[in-house]
Amino acid sequence: MMLIIRYGLLNFETSWVHQKTMVFIQIRKRQKKKLSIYLKHPQVYTLGHRANKEYISFCSNNTLVNLHRVDRGGEVTYHDYGQVIIYNITHLQKINRNVNIYIANLEQLGKRILLLYKTKSTKKEKFPGIWIQQKKIVALGIKIIQRTTFHGLSINFSCSKRNYELILACGIKDGISVNFNEIHKKNSQNQFYWKYKIVLLIVDILAFNNIISF
């Protein structure tokens, strides 16, 4: 059984603290619960723990920019109100065999959400995430501590293109981001939001999940 936590809009710093707290509780109590956190962030840039600062075009000391170096893998990415973000906290029984399977499952989740609107997407060899015609729509980055995962994926719906263009997302030279509403201009954000909520509700009912909303 999976516990689903829905925060709505939450700043990145707070969500990061919440994730780490949940992970360390799981480890300390030797729990193997599955937690899935759904939310949106205000404007923020995050760098993976080994990310290259050359991939950002603004000064990293600029106090007007919300920038954080975090403990996930991957390079730089951008979050804002126009994304659906899913953070999963899951215990991997056999880490060596399950990491690639886990990443593939996260990518499959992103693809299934896009398929709700009959949007075909693909994976790109050596680059985690989901792409539509060489443009990235789903970003992915995870961290594993003692076989317990956290961080997850983000799906672009109506992100600020201007802010996204200030970075070399995931360190890919030709990696251009794309928004869902660029592909489906007839679908409003409200329509997308409610269809997404209905699908989650069906999944919740079928899986008998516990749901906590904030």
From Swiss-Prot:
GO terms for biological process: protein modification process. The keyword Lipid metabolism does not apply. GO terms for molecular function: lipoyl(octanoyl) transferase activity. It is found in: Plastid, Chloroplast. The keyword Isomerase does not apply. The record marks 136 as: Lowers pKa of active site Cys. Its main location: plastid. Belongs to the LipB family. Catalyzes the transfer of endogenously produced octanoic acid from octanoyl-acyl-carrier-protein onto the lipoyl domains of lipoate-dependent enzymes. Lipoyl-ACP can also act as a substrate although octanoyl-ACP is likely to be the physiological substrate. This is Probable octanoyltransferase. It comes from Cyanidium caldarium.
